[in-house]
Amino acid sequence: MARWGAARMAACGPWGRNRRVGAGDAFEASEVRRDGRSRMMPACGPWGAGHGGGDPALERELSRDGSHYSISSAILPSLGARSNRRIKLRRFIISPYDRRYRIWETFLIVLVVYSAWVSPFEFGFIPKPTGALATADNVVNAFFAVDIILTFFVAYLDKMSYMLEDDPKKIAWRYSTTWLVLDVASTIPSEFARRILPSKLRSYGFFNMLRLWRLRRVSSLFSRLEKDRHFNYFWVRCAKLICVTLFAVHCAACFYYLLADRYPVPTSTWIGNYMADFHERSLWIRYVTSVYWSITTLTTVGYGDLHAENTREMIFNIFYMLFNLGLTAYLIGNMTNLVVHGTSRTRNYRDTIQAATSFGVRNQLPPRLQDQMISHISLKYRTDSEGLQQQEILDSLPKAIKSSISQYLFFHLVQNVYLFQGVSNDLIFQLVSEMKAEYFPPREDVILQNEAPTDFYILVSGSVELVEQQNGADQVIQVATSGEVVGEIGVLCYRPQLFTVRTRSLCQLLRLNRTAFLSIVQSNVGDGTIIMNNLIQFLKEQKENSVMAGVVKEIESMLARGNLDLPITLCFAVTRGDDFLLHQLLKRGMDPNESDNDGHTALHIAASKGNEQCVRLLLEYGADPNARDSEGKVPLWEALCEKHAAVVQLLVEGGADLSSGDTGLYACIAVEESDTELLNDIIHYGGDVNRARRDGTTALHRAVCDGNVQMAELLLEHGADIDKQDGNGWTPRALAEQQGHDDIQLLFRSRKAATASGHHHVPSSTTTRVAPAAAAASLIGRFNSEPMMKNMIHEDADLPSRVLPEKLRRKRVTFQNSLFGVISSSQAQRETDHPLSRGGLAATGSPNPSSGSRNAVIRVTISCPEKGNTAGKLVLLPQTLDMLLELGAKKFDFAPTKVLTVEGAEVDEVELIRDGDHLVLVSNEWDAEKMKGKS
């Protein structure tokens, strides 16, 4: 610790080597030395006083890492850099990116501007140092002398390693071998220079001209301003060009006057010929005249009133005009570039419009298509010119920023679309991140009828019409407005688009690609089921449209047959009340105890809806009758609440009771509703009226608070405790006294007296409890399966059926690549990986009798060819082959001895028979070859 403190003290210097991170210090963060070591050190020194952890000022400084300095000029961290929080420089060494050092540099630039004007002026017009001008020069030189000393302590960026070099020796050597000589020469006072120079060179401004070396700082300033987003680039460039022009004119004017002033014959000079007594004229008149001739020469106007009179002036004019050629080219080139850049979009727009018009005329396109082409190009130009290039901007951003922007703009819109009602926010966030916003002009086709389903759109603004072509004419079927979705039927069902979608006004649409959509659904199978249900419900509501009705029938047919191995959850089938679909799903090995995010199982839903057949199927396939959801509810409670007596009986026969649920909650609900029948049912089916809710409240507490004497009496009859405390320490007795319920207090006293005398028997709530389920059923677990999806194979879209010849037309639209088919691939993988599919269930999907699940309903077709019956009869499979033979004898009035398959193979074990098999009952005299011949 002492060593660390000493190191900290040694690190502090007058220039704040370890100063706080300022606006320009974003990448000075980690202590990265050339030896590769990294260490965190506190800041100290007058240019950045040290602060402890959690200092608000330091946090404010660190929050400025995103400033324009940190991006435009500071050090970028190298690949693999472990930290970028602070650079520890040596003692007395200053970072070139320190905020205060930059302020110092900006102050020096003001002095450079002064030097740029005064140095040529003194060189041309002032013969010797005088008054305030000489004093000002010396003050400016003093500041630059300080800067020379300061430069020996400023770290520099090594161009090889791109790291700050803070070795004082290397800094001094680099400065000494580069700019030190010129910097020192430009700060020599004029008086001292006149003394050390020969008499012929004792010009006042000779050494002053070396100060122009400082102009490199102005060039750096303009370079930095051009990259600064707070300044307009056009005006920064214009200011730079103006400064260059004025400086050239000023220098040339000073040189012109110097030539005339030093010429032996004053009248033989450019100004002496025009103004013979120019030496007696004021300094202002001479300077203005010089600037006048300089600028007329620069602009090549040349009125002829001023011209060169001697050889010196002619030679200078030659070089000056050569310089003007280069300067003029530089100015014109820069201004042309700035102007052309502003008009290039318009030029490209006109060229594109002309090309599109020529294309339409040359290919004899219909006027409607030509208008759509022109409208689309015009809208694109408008969005570009108004700064609405949203997709270009979003594509240039990182994924996280792009997703955040999309979520902010479109999340609530997508959330309210009917297709995504009830899905998780995670799915909507993923969908919004993949959507692309597009503009469409009025009367433009967005989707064409019968085209391949590649995208669907959500309307942000505007309206579109759904058009169907009938007998060669367009008929508007429906109008969609903001917040609605179009094209989803073709994408989800993988069939050609049903309608042409055409804009009615300027529209902004969100486009979602089918491939991206289905990829997201792959990882959200539960939400995919909700989307399918929403689609089916929406299509059912479109009864007046025959096309929609046909799509509904097709989807319903595929669902009923279960031919697609759809991974539709059991909850989906139960919600629809489709017991046949539920049976198909259970036979495929789906977990009967699979729950949703709230813990609801299919048995919860079936019990709540009172669907006896679904409840029976689920129990036969091993559903846990006492499964508990996140709220503590069990299926039996759902059935009791809805008064489904038949379902209650089925559940009780399957081993259901209320003891595994939150019976305290149940009893409180019954008391709140003052439902004595429900309370009696709770007690009858294993509920404990003394059990408390999560907050410690019992049903008796609730009855006392409500002043319900009848419910309180019923609870007391079944063993409710009047002295049981809730979460706040209140007992029912204390509550009755506190709230002044005299009837309940009297009831409590009489009940206590009867109990003390021993004349009243209080039945235990456990004496009527239903026997628990079998051990095997109680061990059945519930889990929320997350199916592993197979990689989806995106086949090429089929050609629209309506544009194919009749012989090449598909007989039926395939759903293999629809949303149903895509999600079904996940179910196949889940069945393969499911633990119940290995050992727990037979390979066929039928329950294995060895596992105790033989109670499943298996239907088979039996026939007796010896009696002339080949069509067969559908019967339930008995438990043994002997029972099956007896059943056949009754059905066909015949005594069979063997069971064969339709292929002629003899069946020896009933476990080999699958649901839906066709069995043949024959006698020993039957020849199997006859059956093969018939088949």
UniProtKB/Swiss-Prot annotation:
Extracellular-side positions: 128-136, 200-205, 262-288, 309-312
Pfam families with a match to the protein in the record: Ank_2, cNMP_binding, Ion_trans, KHA
Domain KHA: 859-935
Residue numbers spanned by region Disordered: 826-854
Protein name stated in the entry: Potassium channel AKT1
Cellular compartments annotated: Membrane
Keywords, sorted A to Z: ANK repeat, Ion channel, Ion transport, Membrane, Potassium, Potassium channel, Potassium transport, Repeat, Transmembrane, Transmembrane helix, Transport, Voltage-gated channel
Family stated for the protein in its record: Belongs to the potassium channel family. Plant (TC 1.A.1.4) subfamily.
Species this protein is from: Oryza sativa subsp. japonica (Rice)
